[in-house]
Amino acid sequence: MKEYKDTLNLNTTTFSMKGNLSVNEPKTYAKWQEQQAFKRMQNRKDHHGDFTLHDGPPYANGHLHLGHALNKILKDIVVKREYFKGKKVYFTPGWDCHGLPIEQQILEQLEKEKTSLENPTLFREKCRDHAKKFLEIQKNEFLQLGVLGDFEDPYKTMDFKFEASIYRALVEVAKKGLLKERHKPIYWSYACESALAEAEVEYKMKKSPSIFVAFGLKKESLEKLKIKKASLVIWTTTPWTLCANVAIALKKDALYALTQKGYLVAKALHEKLVALGVVDSKITHEFNANDLEYLVATNPLNQRDSLVILGEHVSLEDGTGAVHTAPGHGEDDYHLGLKYHLEVLMPVDEKGCYDESIIHKKLLDESYLGEHIFKAQKRIMEQLGDSLLLEQEIEHSYPHCWRTHKPVIYRATTQWFILMDEPFIQNDGSQKTLREVALNAIEKVEFVPSSGKNRLKIMIENRPDWCLSRQRKWGVPLAFFIDKRTNKPCFESEVLEHAANLFEEKGCDVWWEYDIKDLLPPSCQDNAKHYEKVMHILDVWFDSASTFKAVLEDYHGEKGKSPSNVVLEGSDQHRGWFQSSLLLGCILNNQAPFKKVITHGFIVDEKGEKMSKSKGNVVSLDNLLKKHGSDVVRLWVAFNDYQNDLRVSQTFFTQTEQHYKKFRNTLKFLLANFSDMDLKNLERSHDFSPLDHFLLETLETISNEVNSVFEEHDFVKGLNILMAFVTNELSGIYLDACKDSLYCDSISSEKRQAIQMVLLVVASKLCYFLAPILTHTIEEVLEHSEVLCAFLQAKDVFDLKDINVLEKLHLKECKKPENFEALLALRSAFNEELDRLKKEGVVKNSLECTIEVEEKALCENLVEELLMVSSVGSANEKISETPTFTLFKAPFFKCPRCWRFKSELENTPCKRCKQVLKERQ
């Protein structure tokens, strides 16, 4: 029997089924760099507006992990999506270069080398070199992810111009009257010997002592109440602060019960305390808290006086209703202390050890000098003697330093703060507080997910003043001079601008290198003898908060692009970068520095647990890239609900690889089957069949859906729509039905050429939607298809744009045939019956069948194509009968070329195939 395989249109494509991504992607990216692809994205002429995504800076320390990849890939997808929509895009990657982690790395290095480095400039030089090293490492690792941006000129917070911009932002804060030096309690990390901002504190579970202590009322107070004996009972989980107690706060207007044994507690808590065994049950007297104000008790630890005061923060839900008050160790205590003019005792040094003030102030005996506060607690509790009514251990949520993961303490020190509740002049001349301006600004920002708005609002409503100063070396200095004559900072414009210019020219190391005279402008140098330098550095959150100013307003390539269209970071940045940027934007410009905030979750293992080296559940980014390639990692990011935590395991990436293969193989099939198209046919109109119209209408519908959800940055929903279309309507229905025409019709067949145009349009749409995600792969698709490039008028992926299907195909509308749903129902029932017949050995495939359909209104050609039967009608040999159709053995012979049972003679081509063979001669 003659072979006809070579007469079929079994077209091929050079686009490989195997992507070999880890080998090919670096070559593609190198080509993009050589061709300056991102500059094309920035400088496109046919644009429809601008789009700026401002990059929240990662820290220039260590290698990238999967969390970094998630963040940067999402940003890249968002930026590319806007580019392919027709916009000029701006994305300058940046790095946060100052701060404690780098200092710690250098200190550890010096310790290993058994050397010390007292010279601050040399120490800062080592820090700078460390940041440079890891900045380059991370930059190259980002490039491996297929991320495009202005990597030739990224922003770095340690660049001289950038340091000057940060300092100028600080100067503006000072000039608006919002920067003040104050002595108040702040979060203090004894592990790194520095103040911490609220954003640098994380909460973890900690075991602490829980003690109830009796403070006996003094004789004069007892006489005032006309009682012989009474002790206020306080509850605390920080026994180490008892030596700094100066007051006991009660709840205003609340009732307090005196027990028979002389213990005074809130009546509302009496029964709870009896159950705990803290106090006895019999109540002998009741007092209103207001009548107890200004009584005096005795601290049993050091016999110092403790004033009875009233406080709004006192709870009647737990404790005793009598709150131990030490203004040096708590925010509420401090503010209440201001009201009552209480002494602020601070007997703890920067290392968390008791200092000499315990002796001078007679707070503790000298045996505690130099002892760490947490170590001293056991002795303190022993020293309380009978005044310690109950000692327990509790596990509770406690603030920890986010860098060292050690507990932090509240410690009153002199620091610099940005004031949240100090009115300052707005652009319209009115006066509002920073808190008010920030809360108003939030209302004008779009949040994805929307819950982010309320989360940020609550944080702004409740946050304290922003502690800016740090007692470290590697950072931008709080470069102010204190006038020793007035003890006030010098905020003269000439002095401040001179310092900023020095920083811009020589870097802010000069603050440590130069004498005061050399830091002053010539006209002010006579005052040098009256000045002293502030030697604190700035909170690194102020560095990163000011990035919008440097990048979008001052000197960078994106100048004039503030506020940015989008910022996109992890959900923890509501308390970090989003918040600090918002506050600084509201100070400098009376508005948020961004229009939209998008947040993503965190990377966790397949059980939902946080990844850590100790657990052995870390998935290596480097290994993933080597095994799967960056486009698979990018598809994994996009195919997940990134707004929640993302679970990771090798299994998830294997599943993603299957999704990738489905898209790739579909594109390969499409490319192969329109590869023989005559380019002259691309612009003319075609006669599209009802089946073509079905697919085109479906394509239009899903395109609108995908555009809509992609606009909301819901990439997983969009990809699921695309995958369902590719699997069901495209592969499962249309391509199955069209293979006969594609393979067996004449190349000049109008029907086949119309199908090819449909495939071309589908490929165009898939490339457009997938390009922001699978950029390497879509570049490869275009490299291997002259026809697709000609159709799209694109030489590479960066020329891609969306197409109007109707315009491209010269159609007024795409409308699927009437009764098409009935056809699909018939197809489903037919396939079910066909499976039964195959199992019973009656037929081997659908082509052996002829079908007679009860619903006569159904188009015969469509029935034949969709069901892939050889003909529609009746025949002699009935093989099956159902309520909706009857199946017969096809009455003709099998065509040896197309395999349909349409030949009149055995081993002879059918009429259609004879005509095609004749044309091929």
From Swiss-Prot:
Residue positions annotated to bind L-isoleucyl-5'-AMP are E569
Q: Which cofactor does it need?
A: Zn(2+)
Please give the catalytic activity noted in the UniProt record: tRNA(Ile) + L-isoleucine + ATP = L-isoleucyl-tRNA(Ile) + AMP + diphosphate
Subcellular localization(s) per the UniProt record: Cytoplasm
The Gene Ontology biological process terms listed for this entry are:
isoleucyl-tRNA aminoacylation
Q: Which PROSITE patterns match?
A: AA_TRNA_LIGASE_I (PS00178)
Entry keywords, A to Z: Aminoacyl-tRNA synthetase, ATP-binding, Cytoplasm, Ligase, Metal-binding, Nucleotide-binding, Protein biosynthesis, Zinc
Q: Where does Zn(2+) bind?
A: C895, C898, C910, C913
Q: Where is this motif: 'KMSKS' region?
A: 610-614
Residue ranges annotated as motif 'HIGH' region: 58-68
Q: Does the keyword Transport apply?
A: no
Q: Name one Pfam family in it.
A: Anticodon_1
Q: Which CDD domains match?
A: Anticodon_Ia_Ile_BEm (cd07960), IleRS_core (cd00818)
Q: Which InterPro entries match?
A: aa-tRNA-synth_I_CS, aa-tRNA-synth_Ia, Anticodon_Ile_BEm, Ile-tRNA-ligase, Ile-tRNA-ligase_type1, Ile-tRNA_ligase, M/V/L/I-tRNA-synth_anticd-bd, Rossmann-like_a/b/a_fold
Q: What is its EC number?
A: 6.1.1.5
Enzyme class name: ligase
User: Where does it primarily localize?
Assistant: cytoplasm
Job description of the protein: Catalyzes the attachment of isoleucine to tRNA(Ile). As IleRS can inadvertently accommodate and process structurally similar amino acids such as valine, to avoid such errors it has two additional distinct tRNA(Ile)-dependent editing activities. One activity is designated as 'pretransfer' editing and involves the hydrolysis of activated Val-AMP. The other activity is designated 'posttransfer' editing and involves deacylation of mischarged Val-tRNA(Ile).
The record describes its quaternary structure and partners as: Monomer.
Give the similarity note.
Answer: Belongs to the class-I aminoacyl-tRNA synthetase family. IleS type 1 subfamily.
Descriptive protein name: Isoleucine--tRNA ligase
Specify the species: Helicobacter acinonychis (strain Sheeba)
